[in-house]
């Protein structure tokens, strides 16, 4: 990582109230190398410039720490982790969390597993599979304190895919861009349908970059009905209470 990239990372983290140590910076620098090399072979990310990766992957991943919603959590699921975001940046700064990085694409999960091992992030567990299937698995259902997602899907889809994984009193932290009123209304109804209530809608700008972001927090307040999640592909094709235009 160049001095400019390091400065951007430090500035972005500082805006989030995080003070990065030399060990943190070393791991982020190694993650940058791993991502750049891996993406050239596996097409892991559309971002290739150091500035974009630092701000729009590393710093953006850390914005789920806003508001302290991860405080007190032990077991956290990153649903739709892709190349490991937000799981890997979170693992670097929060070694107290047991992070499970879930994606349906084997090559991405393999990359996350190799990278976590390379960075000595032993508290990251890779998991390959579909949320619709694993959300019905007794070993996974209602077994997490938090679920984090980053730019995965519309809120009604997220509610159905994520709430089944949460214990009672757990929280979904959905990292998204701007949310329109129709998506928010449908997301509110979908959350209630599957056992949740929206507790916070935190609109902010991405540190340094200035892009609009939203952190939606949903609490698991009731058991998810057994019929959810619906079978594979249905939540995306027929979102609850939502017709995307």
From Swiss-Prot:
Entry function: Specifically methylates the N7 position of a guanine in 16S rRNA.
GO MF annotations in UniProt: rRNA (guanine-N7-)-methyltransferase activity
HAMAP family given in the database record: 16SrRNA_methyltr_G
UniProt subcellular location: Cytoplasm
Predominant localisation class: cytoplasm
Keywords, sorted A to Z: Cytoplasm, Methyltransferase, rRNA processing, S-adenosyl-L-methionine, Transferase
Lineage summary: Bacteria, Thermotogati, Deinococcota, Deinococci, Deinococcales
Gene3D superfamilies attached to this UniProt entry: Vaccinia Virus protein VP39 (3.40.50.150)
Pfam families per record: GidB
Family, as annotated: Belongs to the methyltransferase superfamily. RNA methyltransferase RsmG family.
Organism: Deinococcus geothermalis (strain DSM 11300 / CIP 105573 / AG-3a)
Descriptive protein name: Ribosomal RNA small subunit methyltransferase G
A GO CC annotation given for this chain: cytosol
